[in-house]
């Protein structure tokens, strides 16, 4: 076990995007959207948008330790949510859209998810489960608006 720090900052998930935005701000982040379109951004923009999301979640009353889920594909929006949620100190709970409904209900309730970020094509999955989800306060759909 190493007793000394190898770097002058405490490593955590949010520090990864901070580092990337600082050292490689213009490096491209490319993702394919659900629509099939290719979206291009960069680490600096992902970091800025992740910070905005973190601030909004705190403003809405969510705090460190809360569990916030995502039901999404690997797009730039999911990446921003991942860094934004972890950046404000909440737990990111990634959900698998392939789960049987009973499994999904159990997992969401057991994790005590308070918010679920969801990709538009997966909204019907959550609509079917909604009345059985006891801890979810809010659903946020990833979209362009």
Which sequence ranges carry the predicted segments?
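Structural core segment of the AMP-binding/adenylate-forming
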Residues: 16-18, 59-60, 87-145
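AMP-dependent adenylate-forming
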Residues: 16-41, 143
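Conserved AMP-binding/adenylate-forming core of the ANL superfamily
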Residues: 29-75, 79-83, 100-105
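Flexible, non-catalytic linker and terminal segments flanking ANL/adenylate-forming cores
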Residues: 1-12
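Generic alpha-helical structural signal
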Residues: 14, 18, 47, 51-54, ...
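Short, contiguous strand/loop micro-motifs
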Residues: 3-5, 41, 68-69, 91, ...
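Active-site-adjacent beta-strand anchor residues
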Residues: 10, 71, 116-119
């Amino acid at each position: 076990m190493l007793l000394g720090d190898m770097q002058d900052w405490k490593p955590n998930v949010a520090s990864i995007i901070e580092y990337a935005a600082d050292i490689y701000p213009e490096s491209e982040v490319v993702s394919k959207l659900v629509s099939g379109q290719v979206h291009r951004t960069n680490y600096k923009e992902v970091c800025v948008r992740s910070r905005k999301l973190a601030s909004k979640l705190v403003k809405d009353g969510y705090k460190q330790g809360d569990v916030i889920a995502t039901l999404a594909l690997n797009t730039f929006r999911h990446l921003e949510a991942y860094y934004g949620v972890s950046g404000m100190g909440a737990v990111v709970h990634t959900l698998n859209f392939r789960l049987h409904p009973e499994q999904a209900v159990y997992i969401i309730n057991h994790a005590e998810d308070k918010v679920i970020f969801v990709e538009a094509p997966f909204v019907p999955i959550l609509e079917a489960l909604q009345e059985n989800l006891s801890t979810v306060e809010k659903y946020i759909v990833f979209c362009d608006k």
